[in-house]
Swiss-Prot record:
Keywords for the protein's UniProt record, in alphabetical order: Hydrolase
Gene3D superfamilies per record: alpha/beta hydrolase
Superkingdom of this protein's organism: Eukaryota
GO biological process: medium-chain fatty acid biosynthetic process; medium-chain fatty acid catabolic process
Organism of this sequence: Dictyostelium discoideum (Social amoeba)
AB hydrolase-1 domain span: 117-331
Protein's name according to its UniProt entry: Abhydrolase domain-containing protein
Phylogenetic placement of the source organism: Eukaryota, Amoebozoa, Evosea, Eumycetozoa, Dictyostelia
Amino acid sequence: MFSSRDKAEVKLYFDSNNEENQKILDQCPHLYQKYDKDVTINDRINNIEDSEPTIKNGVTFYPPYYLYNSHFMNYYGSYKIPKLNLKTRREILVNPIDGGTISLDFFELGEFKEDTPTIVINHGLTGGSHERYVQYFAQRAYKEKGFRSVVFNYRGCAGNPITADRAYSAVQLDDIKFVTEYLTKTALPLVKKWFLVGFSLGSAILVNYMADAGKDSPYLAHVSISNPMNMVECTKNLSSTYINNLIYNKGLANNLKRLFRKFDGRLDKYATKEQIMAAQTIADFDDLITSKMFGFETAHDYYLAASSSKSIRNLVKPILFINAIDDPIAPTSGFPWKDFKSNPNTILCVSRWGGHLGFISYEDHMSWSDKAAVEYLSTFLDDNNNNNDNDNKTE
């Protein structure tokens, strides 16, 4: 039924000279477990190849037998798992820089204290707080450790109106900076432990924000899931097969077309409506609109600036990356393996299967990546690394 154990091994890339990484992984059983009595986390493997993992890992990840195909995994994760329809409270914000409208959806999962540790969630390309992957993550974070979760909905997404000429992108950081300042100084000023989690495009925004903010960022730790690490490679992969091009490349381009219809005449300076509607791929659309909107000549130039891969070595706060080798949207080609293994603040976790934002486990048909992410963030809850599940929520 299952493939070999070696294929299923969850591979970890990190700087093992940093004792904090070792302490963190010891507390995350869905990320790391001792492989055997002869290999421990303190025994760094002297790898010849940069793409070889840092340590032999006892953790394996298997999807259900019918989700070994990444396309089935993506479809199941997006459309077949039951909807949660979690209750939210919305706050609408207008960025004073240009009048763009964004929103925050607070998941109302229980009664929270004023200082409850809080996760800010960046959704994917054209998503929002309604997405299954967002809601299941927020629910697990609350049930496991009592986290409060707040979703940052981008311009034009999740019902937000278009009130400015600019949209959003991986390099547009004005909105995440505005949201961060509003949450930490106005909405929830008593919260001391802030966390930032990004999915897909949201993880690219997250990494670019981290690189820009440096140590001034109020977020204690971060998680990036299905990050399109090298966007040039992502574009190649989206066009590499008939299925990838049909389902993802054209599908995501059509999502962008629907979103940008809300801009009406605001896009006339970049392209005609006929040109926009004729775009067949994400690269076509980014060449016409996104690149020009954010000051780049071509989509390729935008991808080089937007890719997380260029920033890994410069990240100065803790972050966990989770990606799958079979991800058709965010392939692992072009990953800066050496940078992950030399930066003491980063941990990269790569599974053989999982697709894009899928990671459905055969054990319980729930997201393995959600479990791993919550475990990782939980290690930062207690200053003495002694977490208490009930400290942060009241029933």
